[in-house]
Amino acid sequence: MRVRSVLLALGFVIALPLGAFAQASISGVVRDSSGGVLPGVTVEASSPVLIEKTRSAVTDTNGRYTISDLRPGAYRVSFTLQGFKTVVRESVELTGTQVLALNGDLEVGGVQETITVSGETPAVDLQSTTRQAVMDQEIVSAIPSSRTPFTVGVLIPGVRKGAFTGQDVGGSVVQEVASLEANGGRTSDQRMMVNGVALSSMIAGGWGGGAVPNATGTSEFAIDVSGVDAQAATGGVRINFIPRDGGNRFSGTIPFSYANDSMAGDNYTGTDVQARGLSVPGNIKANGDFNPGFGGPISRDKLWFFLSGRKLFADNYVASTFFNLNVNDPTKFAYAPGSQAILHQEQTIYQARVTWQASPRNKFGTTYDQENFCACSTVIGPQPGGAINSPEAGVDRRFPLQRFVTLDWTSPVSSKLLLEASGIHRVERWGGMEPQEGKLGNIDSLTPGMIGIADTNDPVTKTALNYRANTAVNPYNNSWNWNIHYRVAMSYITGSHAFKVGFNNAYGHHENTTYSSPAAPIVYNFTAGAPTGITYRLTPRTVKVNVDHDAGLFVQDKWTTGRWTLAGAIRWDSFANSFPEQGL
């Protein structure tokens, strides 16, 4: 077992957002016309995005208030105190985990008199050092990409994509497995979350996995690239999805996009890469995205739903790579290039969300998400080592089952005390498998028993070339895992003081089998078209591992006085895994 702990230093800056499980907050000071602070002012934030309609707080002896656990959207904020005119702020926009500074100035008068303030300069977050980019529906829809946090996140300065990913332009990459890193950090430190709970697999350090909530079913996603708080065990990029909740009226949206090669530009002809020998460039063949969503009330102010689905595909021509005309012919040992090779990617997502206001102080929400994905066939074309993989030597990267179910509970016991709990159960199956039927150009599928050839200097392409069948050692795998993540927290918030304590844990099982084609456990080694040797591949091997616990406990506190904010936190983590009995 490995145990680690960390103490976040105290400082005269705020490093801790107040939001519940990465929700937004409104905080400020209420004064009278003379500048004196006003205790006892009732501050209410109301919005159509809240199934409970309104959240409220009362200013403390220093005139300060904080309203936490607010979902993204437009709010109407009112300030009310007997003997003073009511002040209303309209169209207050909240996004991400921001702590919005919103002060109130009350004039003497009757509460029946109302002063409405609108059209002012938007209030900004002055209390958090977290560097965060919030991508709402408007932003995601406006950017020509496949509308995932990975394709949009790379537009943030200092952020880049890690392994398993390509550069997406205009929806040309259906990126189901991706990672982001910021400021030179590690991709393994990335954490994807739904309502603040990790949506992680049991592999690769827990940075992610195949499941990604679809864009229409998401109200917004926030990408934190620095200044993360004690609720996180790692310091890498955090991507938090806020599910779309429906509402008190029926509404829907149907985003759709399509592109083909006639819409693509030419940045190849007459360029340096052509002069250096790139025989044909990569380009799009066709891609499309259909992502409808619909929601509304089952019972007004009580029970909401939102349903969404998504179908994406992208067919791309692969640079300097061609279908082999001699594929599936066991009598032919030479490579004969035909038409340009195509990489096919497709993804299907079904998602449902239900929100239930069980009582004034108990709100529940649940999300069901099921997905499948295939990059068919991938690992083709020019490879990092300099060799080229012909399409029949590639691998289908398939995710036939990606499923997660979330359950969250929020209870504002009072205007100061907030209780919350959330959990995710996830099941994932994926693997690198033999090329799928219909994805090899001039044939329906690869004939079992075809033996791959690895030529260090193919006489046709004048490069290292792998063709006829896959030539890697145990190139295929069948992997599955299940895991459960959960967390609980309690927040005690006054206007000047914010205290939060929480606990998170995860456990699960991962199993992976690597293998080669049973009908062809060998590879022919060639040089310049002549045989030089044979490589015999290993038999299937299965590795099993359990994550017994991945637990963390955190305590954080913040105190605000005047223009100063003092914050500090302590986090303790414990991790343990085990390996069931297994053999080679």
Regions found by a protein language model. Give the residues of each.
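Periplasm-facing N-terminal accessory domains of Gram-negative outer-membrane beta-barrel systems
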Residues: 2-138
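Outer-envelope beta-barrel architecture signal
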Residues: 113, 149, 178, 190, ...
